[in-house]
Amino acid sequence: MKNNIIRGITTLFTIVLTASLGRIQNTETHFTETWYDLNMSRVIENTRAAGISAEYWVRSDGVKMYGDMVIVAAHPSIPRYSLVETSLGTGIVLDRHTCQDAELIDIATDWKE
């Protein structure tokens, strides 16, 4: 498997989530990946209140980050603050999605809908 360089981010995944793809089945993990574009202020506030401090920022490709980790929303069966591998880099579960699918993760982005 080849490494892909995406705006300075090295990943082992052959397909990466993009705004135009919208949804991918990650071939290296059991997750289906989608993206969402919502205000992160409450998510960041709650994370900091839990004692996990890092810089919130948006990567040049529009992926929302907490420190060096991709912000992810996941099913409640995946503990909050867990680390998960995504096609866009290592993610941290800071948010929840409402889908019943426990194998779906939503990646926080600044990709306008």
Locate predicted features.
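Solvent-exposed, well-ordered loop and adjacent helix/strand elements within mature globular domains
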Residues: 20-113
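Gram-positive cell-envelope targeting signals
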Residues: 1-23
